[in-house]
Amino acid sequence: MEEFQGYLELYRSQQHDFLYPLIFREYIYALAHDRGLNRSVLLDNVGYDKKSSLLIIKRLISRMYQQNHFLISVNDSNQNKFFGYNKNLYSQIISEGFAVIVEIPFSLRLVSSLKETETVKSYNLRSIHSIFPFFEDKFPHLNYASDVLIPYPIHLEILVQTLRYCVKDPPSLHLLRLFLHEYYNWNTLITPKKSIFAKSNQRLFLLLYNSYVCEYESILLFLRNQSNHLRLTSSGILFERIRFYEKIKYPVEEVFANDFPATLWFFKDPFIQYVRYQGKSILASKDTPLLMNKWKYYLVHFWQCHFYVWSQPGRIHINQLSKHSFDFLGYLSSIRPNISVVRSQLLENSFLMDNAMKKLDTLFPIIPMIGSLAKVKFCNTSGHPISKSSWADSSDSDIIDRFVRIGGNLSHYYSGSSKKKSLYRIKYILRLSCVKTLARKHKSTVRTFLKRLGPKLLDEFFTEEEQIFSLLFPRTSSTLKRFYRGRIWYLDILCINDLVNHE
């Protein structure tokens, strides 16, 4: 236990730069104006209102302590004015300003960690596609994987209590509770479809949710990284971090005797790999299904005891990678054997050897994509292209540009697909839907419109990469064929845009 305590103290000592300064210090507002701090490290919030200046935010926060100005009529809640703003805008200003200020220690910690590790071109690590080279390197050596959906906390107070581990400023937490209690139904349950995660307050609640996920991962990954030090000494899992050292001084069994119906024991699994994007994570291991089941029930008890979140064990499925695919970031990924025949010669005798290797196979999800296209009226549920009637009033160039942009984004994102045939089918649907939309606008048939426009329209749908390679190499060359069959991962994809309403 003494050795384990040393590792815990080392881990907690690295959290000191994560403490949150007082919210009412003047220099905090000056730091928020540092565009190099927020834009080079953190993603810009697209929905951030430029009218919400930090000076207004500071004045509004100060006036919130004057209760006679904070009372709002129930019958006239939407029309009540405060400093010239209605309630909704007032709520948005406070939430955006609070999120901007609390983001500062997060960004400072990220900058310092990148400097300590001497990470070169750290912006490449922010790309979604950077996860798949990790899959290609690690997952062929693993046997089992489990899809884990991180459950949402059922109450806003859980998010506030989670934030207190990194925000050591009680007045700001009380301010956050007051704000959430006033502007949102404090007693309602949180679900992903609730208006609490609407775009108008996206920045604040993404910050709260990310702090909740960060707390969950910090404990999970710490115990996973230190598992090799616990091989000979069984130790109960430490959940509460506020009474950390008190629990280390006394026997673990006494501390947790009244908290849990059964003692949870940590186990050694150095081959576990963990990957997450947003609320979905993949837990993969090289060991037996028994250890994977232990991880599953550990997560269920962890969420229930630490975050008071109920999760059903039956919803966490453990699959063998060689027999099942897993859906992650829009790709259907699986591990497939790659058998190659090698001719070997020993003196005068030659013989053939089968060299079997495993590789990651990433497939384009054709059926879900057709369903998405049908939902936004590009085709029917069978995959037959139809005209986009809502775009028929736009100009020809605008219609073509929209279709080309969607097709280019899909080609760019799914460039890592092992088989491009399904992707070409989706591009064909978009091309024909574009032609039908233009023909409907000009009250003509598709055949007549294609004859009049010629093949130039279809050339617009070629991506920039395809155009460059078609100029450098002939169509029949093996280089171009390898390009169409090969996988390309781009390091400039930071988010997944909406299929239609994208910029």
UniProtKB/Swiss-Prot annotation:
This is Maturase K. GO terms for biological process: mRNA processing; RNA splicing; tRNA processing. The keyword Nucleotidyltransferase does not apply. GO terms for molecular function: RNA binding. InterPro entries: Domain_X, Maturase_MatK, Maturase_MatK_N. Coiled coil: none annotated. Belongs to the intron maturase 2 family. MatK subfamily. It comes from the Eukaryota. It is found in: Plastid, Chloroplast. It comes from Rosa carolina. The gene is matK. Keywords: Chloroplast, mRNA processing, Plastid, RNA-binding, tRNA processing. Pfam families: Intron_maturas2 (PF01348), MatK_N (PF01824). Usually encoded in the trnK tRNA gene intron. Probably assists in splicing its own and other chloroplast group II introns. Its main location: plastid. One of its GO terms (cellular component) is chloroplast.
